[in-house]
Amino acid sequence: ISGLALVLWVHAVYGDESGAVWEKLAPKILTVTKDWSASYGLFTDGEADMVLSYTTSPAYHMFAEEDFNKKAAIFPEGHYFMVETVGKIANTDQPELADAFMAYVMSRDFQKMIPTANWSLPSALPQADWPEGWSDLPLPDKVLFYSEAEAAEVQAEAIETWRNALSQ
């Protein structure tokens, strides 16, 4: 998950109050890393109490490591929508192969691998068919999402608000 998603989430939830929210959070922020792996490593090494990660991150620790101490924070305001996509390039010179690959990605066999191969939720598999224990994971009741146009419209302001608050 990206820091930009967090900045957009704070903007979506708090709007004009975003600066005050960032100022309140600033003393609690250990560091801002260049990527998810660096920050998650600080968390798993015990150097940080919390980390910005995926709602499904605890699943890896639960099912792969039998570590039930890591939890997702579920916010009543909702979570910023994060999706990984796959697509067919319009001018591909192999449209049949692209269609076959897309069909495979959407197939039940592929979708059943997503939870424990990518540690994320499958998009085309009913919850009743998720692996054992996955339906018990806490999930947000609400998602927040900016369209591409909306995100482009607020991104510069949201980043500037974040930068100003954290540089105080």
Show where each model-derived region lies.
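Solvent-exposed loop/turn segments at secondary-structure junctions
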Residues: 1-2, 56-59, 78-80, 93, ...
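Periplasmic-binding protein-like
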Residues: 22-26, 32-33, 65-90, 104-128
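Extracytoplasmic ligand-binding site segments that recognize negatively charged/polar headgroups
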Residues: 1-48, 61
